[in-house]
């Protein structure tokens, strides 16, 4: 089944309008594992180090039909996933849903790569604290800050050298050439 970004945004908007469940966005993000992303996800799972996986996630993100752009930077001793909310033309409630979903998705993908022991140290959000702010820390597994200058999820930088559980450098090389051809 191929779903366009527009169709997905309409479905999210409909869900927001029909359900009063403030955790839906987090549950949706947590349900999107790397194995659901075809070659894009398999490439990340196959990389020899987390640093390689992070690099490939950013480089090939267009293959994941993204609703939000991601970037990764190392600042000091921390790895930061940056979530770029560039959908200013969408309703505020839908934008919040997408930010929450993407945050949960990034946490899920890191767990897919390194296991349950890989939790963020802090999540920062550019939006003001929503009414369900207490759920953020519970659902993301870390303290959360609101009113920050950008959306970011922080991890200890030393995890970049860790080997993903399904690492297979030969498969990663082959999958990267397939992704390059897309």
List where the protein language model places each region.
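N-terminal low-complexity or simple alpha-helical regulatory segments
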Residues: 1-80, 132
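Hydrophobic alpha-helical core bundles mediating ligand binding, dimerization, or RNAP-core interactions
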Residues: 12, 54, 103-106, 179
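Conserved binding/catalytic microenvironments
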Residues: 47, 55, 64-99, 108-129, ...
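Short, charged, low-complexity patches
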Residues: 95-99, 103, 168, 172
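Extended mid-to-C-terminal alpha-helical interaction segments
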Residues: 130-131, 135-182
